[in-house]
């Protein structure tokens, strides 16, 4: 009986230590998510402005630019999957990877080859474990993205988009990430970057009119200059949304883990007390039995 009590004491001690870790991680995620949400909000004006500019240039020009023209046949598609570097965030990365798998299956059903690019160690480990190839990987700052990484990703994707199919190039580019809606709602999302599609949320309302531009230099040169920046801003915006979603998911996961730890501590405390009461009862019974035996003799 005493050994059982010691086991419960050890479980209470270890669970209490784990609860402290969960609480610390919850507080860290809570403190960082405010900054992450602010970065998401700060990125929107630039993303909206450059989207309108590119939309205006594309809609008012009649040039056959590869970045805005739908190809006759799409044979290979690039899929950029944005996950996290670290775990302890519930089903955050698993949900994104499930969405990416669904997109990959859909593209293959349409007869397209898929070339995968990954952001985050979780996606890297997922594909490595299954011995599935990926073109490039970026890791190290998924919960605090930097624009330089978005520029590097954008340059790699644009280079492959400009490369011929026979040389390993792609005909369209998709991004799979988690859109941050609120602290309790984050949604795995797929967007197509190229050929150019204006995202509905960033498009101008029907009452707004696109500005009329007089292009200097030529329209094609304007698109050549604008579109790389447009792609970089869209990728960076997706990374910021994913970072806020990751922190929100981690905060919820750590709070849930802490609550579960509290429940376990209560359970082990109750079992320990029950075992202690049983031990005391047994000792009293033995004392009474011994006293009765002495009296009988």
Curated annotation (Swiss-Prot):
GO terms for cellular component: plasma membrane; proton-transporting ATP synthase complex. The keyword Iron does not apply. GO terms for biological process: proton motive force-driven plasma membrane ATP synthesis. The keyword Zinc-finger does not apply. Keywords: ATP synthesis, Cell membrane, CF(1), Hydrogen ion transport, Ion transport, Membrane, Transport. Belongs to the ATPase gamma chain family. F-type ATPases have 2 components, CF(1) - the catalytic core - and CF(0) - the membrane proton channel. CF(1) has five subunits: alpha(3), beta(3), gamma(1), delta(1), epsilon(1). CF(0) has three main subunits: a, b and c. This is ATP synthase gamma chain. It comes from Arthrobacter sp. (strain FB24).
